[in-house]
Protein backbone atom coordinates (compact mmCIF):
# COMPACT_ATOMS: atom_id res chain seq x y z
CA UNK A 1 0.00 0.00 0.00
CA UNK A 2 2.69 2.45 1.04
CA UNK A 3 4.70 1.58 -2.05
CA UNK A 4 1.72 2.53 -4.23
CA UNK A 5 1.33 5.84 -2.38
CA UNK A 6 5.01 6.63 -2.80
CA UNK A 7 4.72 5.98 -6.54
CA UNK A 8 2.13 8.76 -6.93
CA UNK A 9 3.45 11.93 -8.49
CA UNK A 10 4.14 14.89 -6.24
CA UNK A 11 4.51 18.47 -7.48
CA UNK A 12 8.01 19.30 -8.69
CA UNK A 13 7.41 22.85 -9.96
CA UNK A 14 6.11 25.79 -7.90
CA UNK A 15 6.12 29.12 -9.70
CA UNK A 16 5.17 32.44 -8.13
CA UNK A 17 4.41 35.14 -10.69
CA UNK A 18 4.00 38.44 -8.82
CA UNK A 19 1.85 41.00 -10.64
CA UNK A 20 2.21 43.45 -7.72
CA UNK A 21 3.37 43.19 -4.10
CA UNK A 22 -0.11 42.05 -3.09
CA UNK A 23 -1.31 40.20 -6.17
CA UNK A 24 0.21 37.02 -7.57
CA UNK A 25 -0.33 33.89 -9.60
CA UNK A 26 0.93 30.61 -8.11
CA UNK A 27 1.40 27.60 -10.39
CA UNK A 28 1.81 24.07 -9.02
CA UNK A 29 2.54 21.04 -11.21
CA UNK A 30 2.45 18.17 -11.96
CA UNK A 31 -0.40 16.74 -9.91
CA UNK A 32 -2.15 13.41 -10.22
CA UNK A 33 -5.44 13.69 -12.05
CA UNK A 34 -8.14 15.20 -9.81
CA UNK A 35 -5.74 16.65 -7.28
CA UNK A 36 -5.86 20.06 -8.97
CA UNK A 37 -9.49 20.55 -7.93
CA UNK A 38 -8.99 18.79 -4.58
CA UNK A 39 -6.17 21.09 -3.50
CA UNK A 40 -7.40 24.19 -5.32
CA UNK A 41 -10.85 24.15 -3.73
CA UNK A 42 -9.51 23.41 -0.24
CA UNK A 43 -6.93 26.22 -0.39
CA UNK A 44 -9.43 28.67 -1.88
CA UNK A 45 -11.91 28.09 0.95
CA UNK A 46 -9.21 28.51 3.59
CA UNK A 47 -7.88 31.68 1.96
CA UNK A 48 -11.33 33.25 1.90
CA UNK A 49 -12.69 32.18 5.28
CA UNK A 50 -10.01 31.00 7.70
CA UNK A 51 -6.98 33.26 7.40
CA UNK A 52 -5.68 35.14 10.45
CA UNK A 53 -5.42 38.91 10.31
CA UNK A 54 -6.28 42.23 12.00
CA UNK A 55 -9.27 44.54 11.74
CA UNK A 56 -11.06 47.43 13.45
CA UNK A 57 -13.87 45.85 15.49
CA UNK A 58 -15.15 48.73 17.62
CA UNK A 59 -15.47 52.51 17.42
CA UNK A 60 -16.33 55.15 20.01
CA UNK A 61 -17.23 58.52 18.45
CA UNK A 62 -17.68 61.67 20.52
CA UNK A 63 -21.34 62.71 20.57
CA UNK A 64 -22.59 59.46 19.00
CA UNK A 65 -24.71 56.96 20.96
CA UNK A 66 -25.72 54.61 18.15
CA UNK A 67 -24.96 53.91 14.50
CA UNK A 68 -28.09 55.66 13.20
CA UNK A 69 -26.83 59.08 14.26
CA UNK A 70 -25.45 61.95 12.21
CA UNK A 71 -22.60 64.27 13.12
CA UNK A 72 -22.78 68.00 12.47
CA UNK A 73 -20.28 69.11 9.86
CA UNK A 74 -19.56 65.57 8.67
CA UNK A 75 -20.78 64.67 5.19
CA UNK A 76 -21.06 60.95 5.96
CA UNK A 77 -23.52 59.55 8.48
CA UNK A 78 -22.30 57.12 11.15
CA UNK A 79 -23.21 54.01 9.14
CA UNK A 80 -21.03 55.24 6.26
CA UNK A 81 -18.20 56.03 8.68
CA UNK A 82 -18.30 52.48 10.05
CA UNK A 83 -18.33 51.04 6.53
CA UNK A 84 -15.27 53.11 5.66
CA UNK A 85 -13.49 51.94 8.81
CA UNK A 86 -14.10 48.34 7.74
CA UNK A 87 -11.94 49.02 4.67
CA UNK A 88 -8.90 50.15 6.67
CA UNK A 89 -6.11 47.60 6.13
CA UNK A 90 -4.28 47.56 9.43
CA UNK A 91 -1.51 45.27 10.61
CA UNK A 92 -0.83 44.42 14.25
CA UNK A 93 2.80 43.51 14.80
CA UNK A 94 2.67 43.46 18.61
CA UNK A 95 -0.04 41.84 20.74
CA UNK A 96 -3.55 40.74 19.82
CA UNK A 97 -5.41 43.96 20.61
CA UNK A 98 -4.76 47.71 20.48
CA UNK A 99 -6.52 51.07 20.78
CA UNK A 100 -5.89 53.87 18.31
CA UNK A 101 -7.42 57.32 17.90
CA UNK A 102 -8.47 59.74 15.19
CA UNK A 103 -8.92 63.46 15.94
CA UNK A 104 -9.55 65.94 13.09
CA UNK A 105 -11.21 69.34 12.61
CA UNK A 106 -12.56 70.66 9.33
CA UNK A 107 -12.59 71.73 6.71
CA UNK A 108 -10.63 68.69 5.49
CA UNK A 109 -10.77 65.23 4.11
CA UNK A 110 -10.07 62.56 6.74
CA UNK A 111 -8.06 59.57 5.57
CA UNK A 112 -6.74 56.40 7.21
CA UNK A 113 -3.34 58.07 7.36
CA UNK A 114 -4.76 60.55 9.91
CA UNK A 115 -5.27 57.77 12.45
CA UNK A 116 -2.85 58.14 15.36
CA UNK A 117 -1.11 54.84 15.98
CA UNK A 118 0.63 53.54 19.06
CA UNK A 119 3.46 50.99 19.13
CA UNK A 120 2.99 47.91 16.95
CA UNK A 121 0.47 48.99 14.28
CA UNK A 122 0.81 49.78 10.60
CA UNK A 123 -1.81 51.09 8.17
CA UNK A 124 -1.32 49.78 4.66
CA UNK A 125 -3.80 52.03 2.81
CA UNK A 126 -3.32 55.50 4.37
CA UNK A 127 -4.97 57.14 1.34
CA UNK A 128 -8.38 55.56 2.14
CA UNK A 129 -11.01 58.28 2.67
CA UNK A 130 -12.93 57.89 5.93
CA UNK A 131 -14.90 61.16 6.08
CA UNK A 132 -15.26 64.68 4.67
CA UNK A 133 -15.57 67.58 7.13
CA UNK A 134 -16.76 71.14 6.50
CA UNK A 135 -15.93 74.23 8.57
CA UNK A 136 -18.10 73.04 11.46
CA UNK A 137 -16.93 69.46 11.27
CA UNK A 138 -15.12 67.79 14.11
CA UNK A 139 -14.36 64.09 14.41
CA UNK A 140 -12.92 62.41 17.50
CA UNK A 141 -12.83 58.62 17.54
CA UNK A 142 -11.27 55.85 19.61
CA UNK A 143 -10.91 52.63 17.64
CA UNK A 144 -10.30 49.08 18.84
CA UNK A 145 -8.13 46.81 16.67
CA UNK A 146 -8.08 43.05 17.19
CA UNK A 147 -6.43 40.02 15.69
CA UNK A 148 -8.66 37.13 14.70
CA UNK A 149 -9.57 34.50 12.13
CA UNK A 150 -12.25 34.62 9.47
CA UNK A 151 -15.26 36.90 9.89
CA UNK A 152 -16.12 38.89 13.04
CA UNK A 153 -19.90 38.91 13.42
CA UNK A 154 -21.29 41.32 16.01
CA UNK A 155 -24.63 39.48 16.06
CA UNK A 156 -22.80 36.32 17.12
CA UNK A 157 -20.99 38.33 19.78
CA UNK A 158 -24.29 39.53 21.20
CA UNK A 159 -25.79 36.03 21.01
CA UNK A 160 -22.96 34.21 22.77
CA UNK A 161 -21.81 36.91 25.19
CA UNK A 162 -25.04 37.91 26.90
CA UNK A 163 -23.24 38.44 30.19
CA UNK A 164 -21.04 41.06 28.58
CA UNK A 165 -23.91 42.93 26.96
CA UNK A 166 -24.91 44.32 30.34
CA UNK A 167 -21.40 45.68 30.77
CA UNK A 168 -21.39 47.24 27.32
CA UNK A 169 -20.94 51.00 27.49
CA UNK A 170 -23.38 53.05 25.44
CA UNK A 171 -21.59 54.62 22.48
CA UNK A 172 -19.24 51.71 21.70
CA UNK A 173 -20.20 50.71 18.20
CA UNK A 174 -19.38 47.13 17.22
CA UNK A 175 -18.23 46.64 13.64
CA UNK A 176 -18.77 43.52 11.53
CA UNK A 177 -15.46 42.87 9.85
CA UNK A 178 -13.35 40.26 8.14
CA UNK A 179 -9.98 39.51 9.66
CA UNK A 180 -8.89 37.73 6.49
CA UNK A 181 -6.22 39.69 4.61
CA UNK A 182 -7.27 38.01 1.34
CA UNK A 183 -9.54 40.01 -0.96
CA UNK A 184 -9.89 37.76 -4.01
CA UNK A 185 -9.05 34.14 -4.85
CA UNK A 186 -9.61 32.07 -7.96
CA UNK A 187 -8.11 28.80 -9.13
CA UNK A 188 -7.85 27.08 -12.49
CA UNK A 189 -6.92 23.52 -13.43
CA UNK A 190 -5.23 22.80 -16.75
CA UNK A 191 -3.67 19.70 -18.27
CA UNK A 192 -0.05 18.88 -17.59
CA UNK A 193 2.37 16.38 -19.08
CA UNK A 194 5.29 14.38 -17.71
CA UNK A 195 7.11 12.24 -20.28
CA UNK A 196 4.41 10.00 -21.80
CA UNK A 197 1.72 10.81 -19.24
CA UNK A 198 -0.78 13.42 -20.39
CA UNK A 199 -3.55 12.87 -17.82
CA UNK A 200 -2.03 15.12 -15.15
CA UNK A 201 -3.18 18.41 -13.59
CA UNK A 202 -1.62 21.86 -13.35
CA UNK A 203 -3.06 24.05 -10.60
CA UNK A 204 -3.02 27.84 -10.92
CA UNK A 205 -4.14 30.02 -8.01
CA UNK A 206 -4.67 33.75 -8.46
CA UNK A 207 -5.03 35.78 -5.29
CA UNK A 208 -4.97 39.35 -4.07
CA UNK A 209 -4.46 40.49 -0.48
CA UNK A 210 -5.18 43.78 1.28
CA UNK A 211 -1.45 44.38 1.72
CA UNK A 212 -1.04 43.28 5.33
CA UNK A 213 0.68 40.17 3.96
CA UNK A 214 1.95 39.39 0.49
CA UNK A 215 0.33 36.79 -1.75
CA UNK A 216 3.13 34.25 -1.38
CA UNK A 217 2.89 34.36 2.42
CA UNK A 218 -0.90 33.97 2.21
CA UNK A 219 -0.67 30.75 0.20
CA UNK A 220 1.99 29.43 2.58
CA UNK A 221 -0.19 30.11 5.64
CA UNK A 222 -3.27 28.53 4.03
CA UNK A 223 -1.29 25.38 3.17
CA UNK A 224 -0.03 25.20 6.76
CA UNK A 225 -3.60 25.47 8.08
CA UNK A 226 -4.71 22.63 5.80
CA UNK A 227 -1.73 20.52 6.84
CA UNK A 228 -2.49 20.99 10.55
CA UNK A 229 -6.14 20.06 10.08
CA UNK A 230 -5.20 16.84 8.24
CA UNK A 231 -2.49 15.90 10.74
CA UNK A 232 -4.97 13.94 12.88
CA UNK A 233 -5.67 11.61 9.95
CA UNK A 234 -1.98 11.15 9.22
CA UNK A 235 -1.39 10.34 12.89
CA UNK A 236 -4.03 7.60 13.04
CA UNK A 237 -1.43 4.92 12.30
CA UNK A 238 0.78 6.32 15.06
CA UNK A 239 -2.08 6.16 17.55
CA UNK A 240 -2.77 2.59 16.48
CA UNK A 241 0.88 1.72 16.97
CA UNK A 242 0.80 3.17 20.47
CA UNK A 243 -2.20 0.96 21.24
CA UNK A 244 -0.29 -2.04 19.87
CA UNK A 245 2.70 -1.16 22.03
CA UNK A 246 0.49 -1.01 25.11
CA UNK A 247 -0.85 -4.46 24.24
CA UNK A 248 2.66 -5.79 23.78
CA UNK A 249 3.73 -4.28 27.10
CA UNK A 250 1.22 -6.55 28.87
CA UNK A 251 3.61 -9.44 28.18
CA UNK A 252 7.20 -10.11 29.20
CA UNK A 253 9.32 -8.95 26.22
CA UNK A 254 11.06 -12.36 26.23
CA UNK A 255 7.76 -14.04 25.33
CA UNK A 256 7.52 -11.95 22.16
CA UNK A 257 10.87 -13.15 20.86
CA UNK A 258 11.39 -15.93 18.33
CA UNK A 259 12.26 -19.45 19.52
CA UNK A 260 15.42 -19.04 17.42
CA UNK A 261 16.68 -16.76 20.20
CA UNK A 262 16.77 -19.78 22.54
CA UNK A 263 19.66 -21.17 20.43
CA UNK A 264 18.36 -24.73 20.59
CA UNK A 265 19.91 -27.56 18.64
CA UNK A 266 18.84 -27.83 15.02
CA UNK A 267 16.79 -30.94 15.75
CA UNK A 268 14.84 -29.32 18.60
CA UNK A 269 14.31 -26.08 16.68
CA UNK A 270 12.98 -27.88 13.59
CA UNK A 271 10.58 -29.95 15.70
CA UNK A 272 9.10 -26.81 17.26
CA UNK A 273 8.67 -25.05 13.91
CA UNK A 274 6.96 -28.13 12.49
CA UNK A 275 4.35 -27.68 15.24
CA UNK A 276 3.96 -23.96 14.39
CA UNK A 277 5.69 -22.91 17.59
CA UNK A 278 7.42 -19.72 16.46
CA UNK A 279 7.52 -17.55 19.59
CA UNK A 280 8.70 -18.26 23.11
CA UNK A 281 5.20 -17.32 24.27
CA UNK A 282 3.83 -20.16 22.12
CA UNK A 283 6.33 -22.60 23.60
CA UNK A 284 5.83 -21.94 27.32
CA UNK A 285 2.10 -22.67 27.02
CA UNK A 286 2.80 -26.24 25.91
CA UNK A 287 3.02 -29.02 28.51
CA UNK A 288 5.70 -31.72 28.63
CA UNK A 289 3.24 -34.37 27.45
CA UNK A 290 2.18 -32.22 24.48
CA UNK A 291 5.78 -31.70 23.40
CA UNK A 292 6.61 -35.40 23.71
CA UNK A 293 3.86 -36.11 21.17
CA UNK A 294 5.79 -34.01 18.65
CA UNK A 295 7.39 -36.23 15.97
CA UNK A 296 11.16 -36.65 16.41
CA UNK A 297 11.22 -34.74 19.71
CA UNK A 298 12.44 -37.03 22.47
CA UNK A 299 13.25 -36.71 26.16
CA UNK A 300 16.73 -35.35 25.43
CA UNK A 301 15.30 -32.46 23.39
CA UNK A 302 12.63 -31.91 26.04
CA UNK A 303 15.28 -31.62 28.76
CA UNK A 304 17.21 -29.16 26.60
CA UNK A 305 14.11 -26.99 26.14
CA UNK A 306 13.28 -27.02 29.87
CA UNK A 307 16.83 -26.03 30.81
CA UNK A 308 16.93 -23.16 28.32
CA UNK A 309 13.57 -21.84 29.54
CA UNK A 310 14.63 -22.16 33.17
CA UNK A 311 17.70 -20.01 32.46
CA UNK A 312 15.23 -17.26 31.49
CA UNK A 313 12.98 -17.80 34.52
CA UNK A 314 10.37 -19.51 32.35
CA UNK A 315 8.84 -22.99 32.30
CA UNK A 316 6.47 -25.18 30.33
CA UNK A 317 2.75 -25.24 31.11
CA UNK A 318 2.41 -21.48 31.74
CA UNK A 319 -0.97 -19.78 31.24
CA UNK A 320 -0.94 -16.56 29.19
CA UNK A 321 -4.18 -14.60 28.93
CA UNK A 322 -4.94 -12.82 25.64
CA UNK A 323 -2.15 -14.61 23.83
CA UNK A 324 -1.14 -14.01 21.12
CA UNK A 325 -1.30 -10.19 20.94
CA UNK A 326 -3.03 -9.02 17.75
CA UNK A 327 0.06 -7.09 16.66
CA UNK A 328 2.44 -10.05 16.99
CA UNK A 329 4.41 -10.55 13.81
CA UNK A 330 3.73 -7.06 12.33
UniProtKB/Swiss-Prot annotation:
GO cellular component labels: cytoplasm; DNA-directed RNA polymerase complex
Keyword set includes Cytoplasm: no
GO molecular function: DNA binding; DNA-directed RNA polymerase activity; protein dimerization activity
A Gene Ontology biological process term: DNA-templated transcription
Start and end residues of each stretch annotated as Alpha C-terminal domain (alpha-CTD): 251-330
Keywords: DNA-directed RNA polymerase, Nucleotidyltransferase, Transcription, Transferase
Region: Alpha N-terminal domain (alpha-NTD), residue numbers: 1-237
Cited Pfam families: RNA_pol_A_bac, RNA_pol_A_CTD, RNA_pol_L
EC number in record: 2.7.7.6
Domain notes: The N-terminal domain is essential for RNAP assembly and basal transcription, whereas the C-terminal domain is involved in interaction with transcriptional regulators and with upstream promoter elements.
Job of this protein: DNA-dependent RNA polymerase catalyzes the transcription of DNA into RNA using the four ribonucleoside triphosphates as substrates.
Assembly information from the UniProt record: Homodimer. The RNAP catalytic core consists of 2 alpha, 1 beta, 1 beta' and 1 omega subunit. When a sigma factor is associated with the core the holoenzyme is formed, which can initiate transcription.
Entry similarity comment: Belongs to the RNA polymerase alpha chain family.
Protein name as catalogued: DNA-directed RNA polymerase subunit alpha
